[in-house]
């Protein structure tokens, strides 16, 4: 029904783009720019001219196989097939545009059905005279939804799909962002809709947010009480483990950035919440001999949790 409604419009592209932007804004995602493929049409001839090509079977081929591709690619179709540039030509024009805009890392984010593009894009980079190692390709897997313990069957061909807005309606923006960021690009993403909507410790995003809110409550009750980073003569094991975990945060963020692995952040946040809850269960913060230091410790924990949640676009509530 959705596609039928769109097809009946005079300018379906504008309508679809507006719908996408509205959904993404709700999902806390903002693109700096939107570029239509047609904007590269004028650059096609220059891109093709920059490549080593040859004619075969009435088509124009580009030599990408010497640069790591598994075969050469048709870049201009034969007259029998319309004689127009193939999609490889658009890829070449876009790749050149990335380089001309001054970027040294050319990152592509593709879907699970685009594994064949890895060799193709790297081969194109080499054929254009660029180092293929500058091309980074992240292949993200499909999202599987579970409802009442059963997988939701989805098929684009049959029109059986779940739109992002429907997922946000069911579990909220925070949970959706958490679960979509919680897996690496090479791992299938499975979202248990029932669990993601729960307000319990079994739901990891709730569990981490609750740790933040719990600390906020402690700090509110502390009022203007003194805070000191000076540790007591002897640290409890739970204090020591929590401090060590907090000290890991800069390294976790740096590694997540370098490896294009944001999933490391929520995984780390769960460990921080685990360590905090363990510490809080075993030790009083207020009205304890180490109150000033423990207030500093829980405040540091709150800051790290808030920063981790912010990095994956999840809110850090003060109350729950």
Where are the language model's segments positioned?
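Non-catalytic interaction-recognition regions
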Residues: 1-320
């Amino acid at each position: 029904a959705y596609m039928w409604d769109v097809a009946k419009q005079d300018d379906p592209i504008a309508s679809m783009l507006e719908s996408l932007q509205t959904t993404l804004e709700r999902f806390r995602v903002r693109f700096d720019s939107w570029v239509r493929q047609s904007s590269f049409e004028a650059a096609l001839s220059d891109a093709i001219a920059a490549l080593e090509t040859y004619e075969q079977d009435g088509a124009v081929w580009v030599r990408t196989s010497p640069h790591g591709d598994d075969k050469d690619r048709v870049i201009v179709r034969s007259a029998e097939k319309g004689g127009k540039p193939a999609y490889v030509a658009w890829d070449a024009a876009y790749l050149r545009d990335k380089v001309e805009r001054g970027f040294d890392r050319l990152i592509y984010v593709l879907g699970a059905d685009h594994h064949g593009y890895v060799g193709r894009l790297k081969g194109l980079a080499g054929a254009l005279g660029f180092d293929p190692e500058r091309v980074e390709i992240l292949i993200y897997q499909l999202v599987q939804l579970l409802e009442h313990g059963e997988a939701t069957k989805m098929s684009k061909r049959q029109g059986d799909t779940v739109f992002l807005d429907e997922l946000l309606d069911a579990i909220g923006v925070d949970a959706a962002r958490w679960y979509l960021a919680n897996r690496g690009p090479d791992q299938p993403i499975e979202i248990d809709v029932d669990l993601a909507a729960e307000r319990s410790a079994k739901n990891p995003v709730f569990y981490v947010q609750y740790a933040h809110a719990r600390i906020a409550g402690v700090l509110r009750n502390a009022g203007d009480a003194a805070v000191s980073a000076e540790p007591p003569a002897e640290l409890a094991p739970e204090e020591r483990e929590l401090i060590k975990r907090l000290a890991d945060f800069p390294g976790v963020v740096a590694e997540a950035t370098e490896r294009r692995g944001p999933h490391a952040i929520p995984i780390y946040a769960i460990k921080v919440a685990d360590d905090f809850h363990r510490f809080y269960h075993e030790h009083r913060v207020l009205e304890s001999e180490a109150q000033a230091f423990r207030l500093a410790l829980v405040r540091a924990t709150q800051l790290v949790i808030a920063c981790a949640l912010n990095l994956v676009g999840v809110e850090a509530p003060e109350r729950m």
